[in-house]
Amino acid sequence: MHPIKSESAVNTTEQMGVPGPWYDRLPHFKMGFKPSAGKELQSEYFVPVEHAYEAIIALESLQAFISPYLFISEIRTIKADDLWLSPQYRQTTVAFHFTWKQDSEAVMTLLPLIEEKLEPFHPRPHWGKLFTMSPKVLQYRYERLEDFKQLIQRYDPTGKFRNDFLAQNLYSTT
């Protein structure tokens, strides 16, 4: 079954408890096929799992605003880890994933509303997906960020591997 009802299941992996190798079960879509709906936008936020219920209720209050722009959403849990810049650093989280229709203006208007609703639960956004959280707030959420910056300075002192995203989100104080 395809998570988006209007799409064919031909490009999806077998699901619903069917045993198989991890590479055929963890992803929703088969290698070499169009993922999801094709042209789309994505965002994802992680909150400590103990706040799952309250976060779900908070997001549900935005349903009327979110639904017109949403292809699919997913809620999942992820075990804590020890990776400094992981949203799961020392905390098991619940993730709220959104696959949006390709309407950048609408999505970028919705994200601050979602972030505001999740704020009491100290959300951490997915680094590789859309978010509007300020660099100051983002930096505060990652307690080992300063240690990471020291590693960057040690191993990349000239900034060869830095880009605008890192400059804005890791080094900006706004």
What is each PLM-predicted segment?
Residues 1-174:
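Noncatalytic alpha-helical scaffold of FAD-dependent oxidoreductases
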